[in-house]
Structures are given as structure tokens and as C-alpha cells.
Amino acid sequence: SKAKEFFINNIEIKEKLENDFNKENLINKGFQEAFTELITKLVQSKNLNEVKSDNLNQIKSMIETFTIEEEKFINKTYNLRIGVSFNKKKIFEYLSSKNVFPSEIKEEDFLFFPILLDQANNDILIYSNNSFYDNWNSVEDKNFLVNYILPTEDLEDLNLIRKNYSEIENYNFENIIKKYSLQNSIVAIFFKDEKEIKVLSKINIKNKKVIKSNSFNNINLQDEGELKKIIYDLKMIYEDFWKEQDIINTSI
């Protein structure tokens, strides 16, 4: 990424056309949104609160240019879409002053293979009745860098995994993964009992293998809100792991 600027576009802001309407204030609001979007993509979630800023002058000092991509009036509301370009060196200096290391902003495809072990019923669910398979891609955030490809239903794979139910934690999924020709994959095994869900994530990034373990208590998968929160939290864990692979040494 040799470019000297970070460009954030499609920032949409709107405001009612009242007597105190001020276009400049609206553009300033857009600058703040663009800055928040940029740093959310650049840093791991644990550092986000340290580097968020409401200081408009500080944000403006890091902006090179901005463009108005679209403006329109609908129902007495002024709608604005802007693109903002930030000076990369100044952004890096700002993060460095907070002792935070940015990562490359790199979008990437991952095969995501969710396996739900219903321990109460001694059942293994992959495609049907697996709420993680059904809902995984319905939880989105425009700042996510990882794009998930879910497996297509495959009876052969299902039988293979069922056959290895008892040692699923140690099972090597390579035969299944290689069918998809993707460099990166996550096999997530969800161990579900009455009150808790443990998640064992077998992550493979460019031949680097890592296992992560997380647990969620008092979860009801029938509750859409709770289910989506687990999915969002797991996606954040995977986002952070992806960012860890590409930390930029800004001192060079």
C-alpha cells in the first residue's frame, strides 16, 4: 500500500432543513464518520476506544481533500454523500502517539464451516437446523474485512464428519477444505449444552494454523438477538485475528 492517502467514500449523512440548518456542520459530521470508519478498519477492536476522536480540528488536520459525491433534497431533508481522503502519514503519526499499531486494510475471503454439536441430543448439525449456518452472513458491518464463503450442502462431507463425531476436536478437515480452493478457512465447532456454547475455531490462514477457544453463557439460540450477538462477537474475534497477521511497522 504505497499510496499516500486513505480514501473513505460513500459516507451518507442527512439533516432536516430547519431554520438553523448549516451545510458545513453536516459536512463536519461526515468527516467524523469517515474518520471513525477508517480507524475501525485499521486497528484491532481492543484499541478502538483509545484512538476514537471527537476532536474535529484534530480530524480535519489529517484530511487532505473531500468530495461531494451526491447531494439531494427529499421531503425537506438534505441528503449528502461524501468521500474523504486522509493523509496516511498523519494518520500513522496519530496512532503512534496513542501507542497503537495499525494493520493493512485488506479484504479477504474465508471458507467458514460451522458445525453444531447438540450434546443433549448427541446430534451433529451442519447444513439443516444449524442456526449458525443459516444466519452467519445475515450479520454484517461495513467495516468488516473478512468475507465468509459458506460450504454448499454435501452429503459426503456430512457423513465423513458424522463418522468422526467422537474425535471431532482433533479431526483434520483438509479433505473437505481443499474442495473450495480458498487460502483461508475457519472450521468452527459449536459445543452446545443446556446453558453454554463453547466454540472451538480451527483457523487456517495461508498455511498458518491456529486454534481459538471461546465460550458464551446463558445463550438461547432460539432468540434471534442472542444468536446474532454471538455471531457478531465471533466475527470481531476473527477480524482482530486477521488484522494481527498484517500489522504495519509505521516506524519505517
Language-model region placement:
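C-terminal/domain-edge helix-coil "capping" segments
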Residues: 24-41, 83-106, 141-145, 176, ...
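Amphipathic beta-strand/beta-sheet edge segments enriched in Tyr/Trp
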Residues: 5-10, 83, 87-90, 177-225
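Non-catalytic, solvent-exposed interaction/assembly segments
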Residues: 8-10, 20, 33-43, 48-53, ...
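N-terminal segment of the mature soluble domain
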Residues: 25-50, 113-166
